[in-house]
Regions:
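S-adenosyl-L-methionine
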Residues: 55-105
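Short glycine-dipeptide loop
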Residues: 25, 48-49, 116-121
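Core SAM-dependent methyltransferase catalytic element
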Residues: 140-145, 154-225
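Conserved SAM-binding loop of SAM-dependent methyltransferases across substrates and taxa
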Residues: 35-48
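Conserved SAM-binding loop and adjacent beta-strand
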Residues: 1-13
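C-terminal substrate-binding/active-site "lid" region of AdoMet-derived donor-dependent transferases
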Residues: 106-176
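Conserved class I S-adenosyl-L-methionine
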Residues: 25-34
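Conserved SAM/SAH-binding loop
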Residues: 9, 34-35
Length: 225
């Protein structure tokens, strides 16, 4: 497949499908189309009833992604690729999923909250943990919740007769995946009912605790009584 931008590895593509809960018929915004590897993976999972809307800031990347998709899946696929900057906003609404392969996805978090349907999922792919930390801070200060970050390490095994061991090489870190869900706001609680004023309790009668002591003193002073 002709490439311009670096593609997302198959081990991460599979994790995106599962953890972003990509389902047949979903409406998905993908930004950072690059060479179209994730785009093709999504289209195969969505089926003919779904739709992928791509936002790609570079015209050459957008063209390459379209050509790669057509070469592998044909021209009749539910895909729209627009040359635009997702950092400036998202016009689409009621989306099911938003998938980002961008240097600064935290700038998209406020736009994503307005474009996703409630319960929709935001998923971002990032190469460095410092980028992840910035993204997670933005998510924590937004309407998103249930956030998690992970990476996928793929290790194959050498299996030949009784020789069974891990291969000497593995596809380890390629990127971090962060997934969060747009939560439904909690309903406003009704005001607490007014409690009727209750009259003050009657003061208890004063008890003369000294009375018994005085009587005893009088008896001792007058033994003949």
């Amino acid at each position: 497949m002709p490439r311009g931008a670096q593609v997302i590895y198959p081990k991460d593509l599979g994790a995106i499908l599962v953890h972003a809960d990509v389902f047949p018929g979903a409406r998905i915004l993908e930004s950072g189309d690059g060479s179209g590897a994730l785009t093709m993976t999504l289209l195969r999972a969505l089926g003919p009833e779904g739709h992928v809307l791509g936002y790609e800031i570079r015209d050459d990347f957008a063209g390459r992604a379209r050509r790669n998709v057509e070469a592998f899946l044909g021209p009749d696929v539910p895909l729209t690729v627009e040359v635009r900057d997702v950092y400036e906003g998202i016009e689409a609404t009621d989306l099911d999923r938003i998938l980002l392969d961008l240097p600064e996805p935290w700038r998209v978090v406020p736009h994503a909250a307005g474009a996703l349907a409630r319960g929709g999922i935001l998923c971002a792919y990032l190469p460095t943990i410092l980028q992840v930390a910035t993204l997670r801070a933005a998510i924590a200060d937004s309407e998103f919740g249930m956030a998690q970050t992970f990476e996928v390490l793929h290790r194959t095994w050498h299996v030949e007769g009784q020789s069974v061991r891990p291969d000497h090489r593995m596809v380890a870190h390629t990127g971090f995946l962060t997934v969060a869900r747009l939560l439904t706001p909690e309903p406003a609680r009704p005001d607490a009912p007014d409690t009727p004023d209750t009259p003050d309790a009657e003061p208890s009668e004063a008890v003369d605790h000294d009375t018994g002591a005085d009587d005893l003193a009088d008896d001792l002073a007058d033994p003949g009584s």
